Amino acid sequence: MFSSRIWLLLAVTVGVCLAVPDLDEIKKNLRKHGPDYYKNQPKMNENTVRLLKVDYWFRTESMIYDDIDNKEKDPSTVIAGNFSFETLHHDVEGGMLGRFTLTQCNTDNCGNPSPIYIAFRQGGNNAEHILKASDESDATWNFLYAIVNTIYTPAEYGEGDEQTVDTIYGRCFVNFGRPEDKRFRRIIEKCDLGYGTNFTKFEGIESVQYDQDVWYTQNTKVDADIIMVDAIEMLAFKSPLHEKYGFTLESRTHVEITNRTRVFVTSYCNDTVPSAKCAEQAFGAVRVGGKLYEHVKIAQEQSNKLTKLIGTYRRHLQDMGDSHICEKHSLLYSQIAQEARLAKRQDWEAAIQYPENDHVLSLIASALGGVGTAESITTAREVLLTASPDYLDDLLFGISQSSSNNEKWHKQLMYWLGSLDKKSEEYWKVANTIATVLNKRCEASTSSLNSCNKGKETIVNKFITDLTAGGVEVRVLEVLENIPIFGSYTFAKKFICETESEDVQKAALNVILAASKNLYETQLTHKLIKLFRNTCSQETPTSHSQLAIDILLKCVPDHQNVATLILRTETLNPDDQEKWHYLYKAIEASGNKDELKAEFWSRMRKFKVFRPNFLHRALQADSHVHWQEIADASNFQLFSTANTEFLQKSFKRSIFELSMKKGRKEHNLFSLSIDTEHLEQFVTGSASSRSGAPQGSVRIGVAGHKLPTHHIFKGSTDLLSTVWEADGRTHKAFEGHVPVRDVRLSVPLLSGLTLDVDSVGAISMRVLASAEVSLWNQRSNAKAEAYTSGSLHLTASLYHHSEPVRHVESTISALSTFTTDTRAIFETLPYDFCLRTSNSNVDINQKTVVQDQIGKHKKKTLNRKRVHPGVTYRLDDSTIRQCNSYLEQFRL
């Protein structure tokens, strides 16, 4: 009882103390308004609350420019005027309801925005609910929403000063600094912009930087009001490929208090009513979102341009012909691929069934495949493949290059595969494509890759299980090469150094070679060493030994014992000179590519037992590995690797790969694998113990996807037919388009304007091949030309009240041709030949268009061009020796 009285007394004391009037405030009001000021005040009752109305003056300025040198000359958009902020309600949970209203416009471009209501959390200014007046039909971004977004933070209440959260711009880092000298600071940066399409195949080809810096000045004497706000906002799209590419946007906002009024009114809602609910009940406000402003219109409505762009591409193709490509091929395809995502089924039906589009159906099929939705698969099967089944390959290539990671799309692909006969060619083509699609699903993030490798991805497990259920086939392993995860690796490893056929073991080695070195373990390395040493139960072909070398060298230096096991096998009388020559060249190539590996092998050779000897220079062999850097600029390294095997002076197989590396991430751009069997009996005139029917096959890989193997000839009859048909005519070996950039986003600015940005990019490639064999002159000439076009295109449009203000376009394109020319003389056996590899001039064009959409509509166009001279690439020592021999024969 006594304690209860003490607590009651303390409560009364606190209440009395808190009720003591502010004498300084009373004296101030008496001096200002006279002695009758308090007599004339309305009588307050228990339903009367004290609220605030604060008047502010504001000014915002926005500008977009293509180059910093033009910043001072370019126009800007200014909005200035006055607005008021009113407090309307406080709830018991610490929430507060405020209203922002335009009171005056000084620049005649403010429009007529309706008041905005915001429910926020006191203490941290955390925005929770945004509401609009009921008489406003559509909520469209304007400067009132911008002011609200400037003052209130998207950070979560109570989660600290530094957070990475979802904002209206995307997922961003938000820092709300503690007060220093009456000033707070909010920084928003490191944003993953946009909630729509934001795809980049090669990280770093286009950099996007968004920064927001807001300073708040507080009045610490009277209720801690914000008396001044200064905000700076910057958005820049740039590319390391060209310093003039892109644009920069800046906006600045200044807000300053002009008046502060206390008002006493009857409370609008009971304090138990949440602030957002009070806005709806008392003011009829309608919610338009939370801190993400979900139902506020930001992006401008645009009609779909798919049909128009396809028509433009068709006319361009008619004017230019089909012999080569230009920068417009890749540019137009990238735009078509972007519009394809928003196209409806009737748009596709119209494009596919339009008679004049027959010669561009390959492009339409590729774009449809790249959409990556369940609806696109249905449209492709029911419309495209029903009317034009010959375009299955183009459709599948488009699917393989899609950036989509849609679960329903993956299931539709699996349903399609399940409906096909496993004995049909279509089944294996579709399976080969699905393997690449699911591999992208696994590589989407570190966690998803771990999930795939641990067998936790149901759809991936089902695909591999169904594919391998019918037993082992070479085609099964070729498909698994496109999805080299742990399940594929484990399946392939079972056939290494076992009793399976040579073709199966070779295909299994290719799967393991494609897999990550993180999957390799001691059991595998021991099997590979046995292959290399030719100590398996079956005799090991040289091809298998060389593939084993390629895999073992990937292990180094992670598995350091591998180097010891290899070098211990060295002798002065090697069993297979081609194998050992290939090993030494492969070690040299790996050292050229990676300095750490070069240092590792150098240290190994310093041991007395492993010191190099005359054997390295005395080998009479032509098999080799050649690594060559092509370009290194802007942190991108472009290089090629060529692996070639010879058997008894005759060509056996080769793998050429063109790759790009940025940081630790390596991308395969193009690969060409040529494989032959049993040709030595025709080339050298001698039959080996492995003699059989001659075979030749080719497999092309583009942007991480290996196409199905194409068999050139099987048997002597096919070989002879191929030779007779080699009359020098040019054939199209491959044509395809690879999207590399697809971004579409709308950015609401703190100045009240909005910015729509579209960024697209693609690489187009056309490979033409020709071969001529003259049995009379005993000469042959084979030529392959890869015409390559790449484009990156960016458009940025600044809008004010949905009206265009300024438009910037920036484009960069590159065009070049890669050529290989092989000539041979077969007057004597073994024949002599020479290979020449070259690259034509690299033409780089950059174009910028800046156009004002108001006033005189001034337009500025800038064209810039650079030409990098073509080069003929240095050959490996073995190839140089062969070329010298060829030239000697040619002179004779």
From Swiss-Prot:
It is found in: Endoplasmic reticulum. GO terms for molecular function: lipid binding; lipid transfer activity; phospholipid transporter activity. GO terms for cellular component: basolateral plasma membrane; endoplasmic reticulum; Golgi apparatus. GO terms for biological process: endoplasmic reticulum unfolded protein response; IRE1-mediated unfolded protein response; lipoprotein metabolic process; lipoprotein transport; plasma lipoprotein particle assembly. Its main location: endoplasmic reticulum. Residues 1-19 form the signal peptide. Keywords: Endoplasmic reticulum, Lipid transport, Lipid-binding, Signal, Transport. Disruption phenotype: RNAi-mediated knockdown suppresses the slow germline development and the delayed egg-production of clk-1 mutants, but does not affect the rate of postembryonic development. Pfam families: MTP_lip_bd. Catalyzes the transport of cholesteryl ester, and phospholipid between phospholipid surfaces. Does not catalyze transport of triglycerides. Required for the assembly and secretion of plasma lipoproteins that contain apolipoprotein B. Required for normal expression of klf-3. Heterodimer; heterodimerizes with protein disulfide isomerase. This is Microsomal triglyceride transfer protein homolog. The gene is dsc-4.
